Amino acid sequence: MNNYTIIGIDFGTSATVVKVKNYYEGMNDSDCQPLMIGGGTIIPTLVFERKNDGKLFFGRDAESEYKAGSEGVLHRNFKMDLLIPERKENAQRLIKEFMKYLYQQFLLQKPQLNVSDTVKTFISYPAKWTPEIITFMKQSVVDAGFGTADTVFGETEPTAAIYATFTNHEAMLKEQQLVAQEIPINVMMLDMGAGTSDVTIFRFMADKQNKFHIGHDGKIISHPAVDNAYLCGGREIDRLLCDYNLNYLRQVFPGSEVHDGLKQKNESGIKEWKETHVSPRLQENQSASISGEMMTLIKMLRSFSPNMQNIAYPNLDRAAFETATKEHWRQLHTLITDAVAKAAEVIPEIKGPEDIDLMIVTGGHSQWYCVREMCLGHSVAGLPPINFKKIIDNPKRLLSEARPQETVANGLVFRDLSFDITHTSANNLWIQLVMDDKTPSDIYQVLSQFETLPVQKSFEWTQKQEGGSFCLDDINIKCHCCYGADMETGLSYTAGVNAAMNSFGDLFFKTVLLPFVLMGGGTETYTVVTTIVVDVNEDGSAIVKGNVNCNGNIEKFVINL
């Protein structure tokens, strides 16, 4: 293969991730390198505009400049301003400058990243964004220096997430037989960022060449719409936790205004406290405490304020957290149920949450324990459970990464990998034999849905039959074949021996008549042994072969499924 490099830029509301992957013979598929800025892989999507000279600072530098007390404006969440007409122009200016900053950082690290001469760059965007915004984002990457219109591409976040999911979970997906060639599945992606949470529901399929098709039927449901924002982003939790702490501080400072220093410390440190302490503690079902910095400041102020109350920090366990943030989870619950209802209107294979086959959860805000609990059918904050039956029955169908903020960026650089999805059966197959319309065999499940193809299965049925010693009456042995998700909902089809069928996926019911006569005298008990052999090919076509042996006499039959 020719060596080349893919750069993936996931430009998020509060955080940006840039990944680089080199493609060459013998590479490790899952290897990719992050653009490291300030010692971290997560770049805060921040721009600080200093007042006196208009100088711009980006990422952690912007954060440091703001905390140092420099006079100016800290621009945050400006990605969302692309959707607001009166703020759009300023948002475009900031995004262009931010992309230039990323490219300058890339150039500094380019030697260590071993970048090839041939480079492709991908930038992600929400599936619901308009063509106008997508064009602007791609052009911003081109203008920054990452490439030309021929080498810079856009990719939807759900598509990128699928590539990351398959790269990191390929073995499990095969083991659980969750994906197969030419078998569409219903996928729901929940992307929870700092600004918003978005649900995307679509049909996914891998073709015979293992090429991925997202919304292959042209139907991708993205909810909410561009002009309808639900307040389900991480910054809403920040605000609610700020209020929780502020209520405590008002009890500590009764009858007076909370000290400005405490207010500022509460607001500036809330995100780090949330991510490094509150979320991990609640994940383990343990209580969280106020940050050490806040407690130190309270103790210091207490020595100067004798009226301060010595009140312990209220226990922030799961119950208290869900009470304080109930409105947030109610909106997320509504967002999800509305998205599924919308999908049910346009995707015939989806009637409700029980029809979702695979769920992908991404974004930094998805790390809250409440998200997993809700997806697994548990009640959160007193809200009714959502019946994601297939996910509840098999939690392995709920996929997330250890670092969910990096999922989309990883998927952007993994998109050129080849995936080995084996040929598998689209349906279950059951066979039952019946002698003379009155003596049935057991029902044999000879093939399971998602079973690897090609495969050969067989079973044997032995039955006693009485007849005259000179003549055994004609025996009719019928072979009933049924395929599908279950026997109750299967289609029915009747055909004779050697009937030509299109494929295994088109057959349902077969009847084969096997008349034979044995000559003799007197009365005897005959042993009738029927052997069935099923051969299913890679393309899903199947042949059922049968041998009937009655005291040495054999009748053969073949059914083409």
Task: Please give the residue ranges for each predicted region.
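Gly/Thr-rich phosphate-binding beta-strand-loop-beta motif of the actin/hexokinase/Hsp70
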Residues: N2-D29, E170-I221, V528-V534, G540-V548
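Glycine-rich phosphate-binding/hydrolytic loop that grips phosphoryl groups
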Residues: I6, L46, F153-M172, R235-D243, ...
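Phosphate-binding loop and its immediate beta->loop->alpha context
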Residues: Y24-A144, G233-S289
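Gly/charged contiguous loops adjacent to phosphate- or pyrophosphate-bearing nucleotide/cofactor binding elements
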Residues: F58-H75, Y230-L376
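Phosphate/ATP-binding catalytic cores across multiple sugar-kinase/actin-like superfamilies
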Residues: I95-L113, A161-Q176, A319-M359, V371-M374, ...
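Conserved helicase motor "Helicase C" RecA-like lobe of SF1/SF2 P-loop NTPases
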Residues: T135-S140, W368-K390
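Hydrophobic, small-residue-rich alpha-helical packing segments that form membrane-like cores
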Residues: Q139-P184, M192-G193
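Acidic low-complexity intrinsically disordered segments
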Residues: L332, D420-L561
